[in-house]
Amino acid sequence: MHEYSIVTALIEECERHAFANNASKVSRVEIKLGILSGVEPELLRTAFETFKLEGICREANLVMNIQPLVLRCLDCGQSTEHSERSVICSHCQSGQTKVLDGEDMMLMQLELEQA
């Protein structure tokens, strides 16, 4: 389960930002999770709840915003959003597409509290 290593890195990044801003705790962690990121949201949530138990993130709430797949068709030029994992242009049915968004996981926002 690579979600464990991803959560470990996420918590380390949260801690780095918290310490850099003299925060005593992290209360909210917001991430963007692309549907093609290869990360399973429920496994990620379980891993986060497990690994946050010690440290500055122990009371943090994880907010996951699922990012749809955004494609640009190289044939017709249309940009479209897809909620499923399909790289076919929904406008002209071409397979010649470029992924613009929906492949990544990103830390978007932290809510920090100071003592």
Swiss-Prot record:
Transmembrane segments: none
Name of a matching Pfam family: HypA
Binding site residues for Ni(2+): H2
Purpose: Involved in the maturation of [NiFe] hydrogenases. Required for nickel insertion into the metal center of the hydrogenase.
Entry GO MF terms: nickel cation binding; zinc ion binding
Organism superkingdom: Bacteria
Binding of Zn(2+), residues: C73, C76, C89, C92
Taxonomic source organism: Shewanella halifaxensis (strain HAW-EB4)
InterPro entries: HypA/HybF (IPR000688)
Keywords: Metal-binding, Nickel, Zinc
Descriptive protein name: Hydrogenase maturation factor HypA
HAMAP family documented for this protein: HypA_HybF
GO biological process: protein maturation; protein modification process
Assigned protein family: Belongs to the HypA/HybF family.
